[in-house]
Amino acid sequence: MLILVGSKVIRVGGSFVKSNGQCNCLVRLFAAQIPSPPVAESQFQNEWDKALPYEKIPGPSRLTLIKDSLPGGKLATLNLGEVLEQYRHQYGNIYKISGGFGTPDTLFVFDPKDFETIYRTEGIWPFRPVLETVEHYRKKVRPDTFYSGGLGVEQGKEWAEFRTTVNPIMMQPKFVKLYIPQIDQFVDEFIIRMRKIRDSNIYELPENFEEEMDRWSLGATCLVALDSRLEIFGELDKNSREYELTAALKRFIYLRSVLDLKPSMWKVFPTADFKEMMRVLDVITDFSFHHVNEAKKRLESKVNTKSEKEQSVFEKLIRINPKTAVIMATDMFTAGVDTTSSAAISVLYNLAKNPDKQEILRNELRKILPEKGSPLTQQNMSNLPYLRASIKESLRVLPVVNGNSRKTGKDLVLKGYRIPKGTLVLLQSLYTQVDEKLYTGGKKFMPERWLKNQESELSKEARKVSPFTFLPFGFGPRMCIGRRLAELEIEVFVSKLVRNFYIEWDQPDLKFKTVGINVPDGKLQFKVKDVEN
């Protein structure tokens, strides 16, 4: 296939990729995601003519949804994930919630074949809905700080230009792996903290352990986002920047769900929640800006003796533009801390519920960590198939998000209905990735299905399933920019904890709720008993 990029023609799927310098990174990023050859125009027109009109797609109105969600309504006691599942049973694998109150229609799809169709036709500048409060803050309240809305706000050409700038830095495993020693040491400190806060008689962690997990994730993120080591465990001075940041991030998660994920009047007049959100974003932004300025002074005061490959992610970003570093830091705080924490919790929970799998992983880790305090390195982390299979399986069974979202890049026909270009679609993979028809023991935690060097029926089956069934970090040009960092943080965290502790769960099954992402809905009372050696 030949496509035009800038002023030059390039071959995709062949042996070369060429373009001018500005677009070259974008070409490399998008080349592997170029859609399959399109259906012949006449064939598509025939499908379109036979399809039912968009208006015939079943589903509730926005007003009905609001009414049913009020106290006493049939949806009042359900979380968002349960509501979507109930509608799926009622309407099938495609339905829409009609727009209203300034919001567009939202189409929900549940079939991996439809996921693939949408992704394959999204174009090189995919449109993904943004948090409008964050967009308002960056473009209306603090445009002096944010020369760009960043990856979480921008669309089209502006998004592509910013992604082109940061992608070679954020998505390169070799750059992220430079942080293994620092993250390893930080997890060692967290293990000391866990031993201190657990019950000395029954080895049970406190009910608020989720807050400790959030602090671990925040601290690990700061190592990369700001080249800063936070003293974040234990009691924090309420006047400290660290305390203000942790409090702000906690409120951000709540306010995001109230203002951006539910109907709100903030666009009509500034509600109390909206005003608080602006203050919260000020705290997060000012924290990032402070550390960027401090780092800039440090870099300017000393001769740079590091080669490019030795420079940290943060150093690379700040040398491009200090404001770019601020944008990426705030994005990592608002989009990465809670998701990484929740993902790590789900891995611990699945391993605790499956002690036989936990022991297999521990035996794998003993080979590279002969002592409980042995450090992780780039070299000894290079071959840990069961660790990575365990993390992947946990993200399948207990995903951090219900799916992904896009606006359709062209007119489509899905499930016999006409879907106009520009329709907002939510791709609900939460249900397909545990479907018993696709995965044997779909809801069971079985990491063996992802071991590439095995020829078990489980692994053979997993290889046959469409990859669009399960995409925990998204797909294509708008794939999660923090994927490499999140994977590394979780790998180091799980490795060190499993090598040090027998992780147990003797409570009722842990439930999760949807607040934009899926988070634990209950107390995290893990038991952690020391491994002898």
What is the role of each PLM region?
Residues 149, 453-490:
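Cytochrome P450 heme-thiolate "Cys pocket" and heme-binding signature region
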Residues 11-14, 23-26, 30-144, 157, ...:
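N-terminal membrane-proximal hinge/A-helix region immediately C-terminal to the signal-anchor transmembrane segment
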Residues 217, 221, 280-289, 315-364, ...:
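Central I-helix of cytochrome P450 enzymes
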